[in-house]
Amino acid sequence: MSKVKHIALIKFKEGTSEEQITKIFDDFLDLSENVPGIEDYVAGPNCSPEGQSEGLTHGFIMTFTDASARDAYLINLDHEKLKTAELALVEKLIIFDIEL
């Protein structure tokens, strides 16, 4: 089975504090350490000099062992709670998965 890269690109709503953003990413890190099938998690602000981010300011990437691990994560209750909290702060979100 192929690994899956789960990519989230985010533009937070105006007025969202750095502390709120850090908490969201820390909570996703905690989640990634407790959900089976997640091999890696990285997150941070956009640092591209190309100017093609279309306002997206932050992102994260999770690497899953396979598509079934990703699918289990998507319906995980802790993920659902965290997603709800995150979406309250998000103006724009793009999710893109790549099978390796």
Predicted stretch roles:
Residues 1-57, 65-75, 99-100:
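Short S/T/G/P-rich N-terminal loop/turn motif that feeds into the first structured element of a domain
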Residues 37-41, 85-98:
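Conserved short beta-strand edge segments in small beta-sheet-based binding/regulatory domains
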Residues 67-92:
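C-terminal structural segments of small proteins and small subunits
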